[in-house]
Amino acid sequence: MTQQTPPEEVARIFDAEVRDAELRDPDTGGFQPSWNVAPTDPLTVVLQREDGRTVERPRWGLIPSWAKSAREGARAINARAETVASSPAFRVAFAKRRCIVPADGFYEWQQTGGTRKQPFFLGPIGEHVVLAMAGLWSVWKDPVTGLWVTSAAVITTDANSDVRVVHDRMPVLLPREWWAAWLDPDERDQDLLRSMLTAAPDGILDIHPVSTRVNDVRNDGPDLTAPVDPAADRVAAPTSRSRAKATGATPDTGQGTLFD
């Protein structure tokens, strides 16, 4: 997905606070915009604490409280709407630790024959619009370091007609009128919560093919969301990214299946 909106602007949109001083100061590196957020990366979320709504940066990939290691969260980047209320990994978070993942857009991959997949960028139609993805969060204590780790996942559902042309799943996108109930940890009406986990209406997303450079998490930058002619697309070298290395194998981060 892409997250370029600064935490302070996210706080304004969602009537929340940025309490972490590093997130308020771009010079500290606490928040860096990304056009290629990958699993285990920091992820901007909005969640409800006991004393108010906050903007935080957990890692993407929910680590259940009972997990023995952080590795168990590396692939738990998505929770399926159909099973989230009963899944051992997600049911506790669904009951009382729901969050919103504000995104400026996301990627889906279309199977084009054989093993090739064509990436598409899906972004909101209109300027200054942030997508409110339904998410879950959790806290886990690392048994080795003793440190508490906050992590999060995105909930997915069957795709609407527009998105289905590319992929059969998509993130749940919450309309503004559902934000308060979704974030409220005291809201325990399972039927109400499950009723929110439906596909967004057609006509709200701009969808276009983008370069296969997005398949490599070492690549980052606004050019990744630019429309391309798939027939003319050629993979280029990685652009600057803090975790990029001049040599070495590309890690398996699940790119190509992010929102299953």
Describe the role of every protein-language-model region.
Residues 1-260:
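Short linear sequence motif anchored by a di-proline
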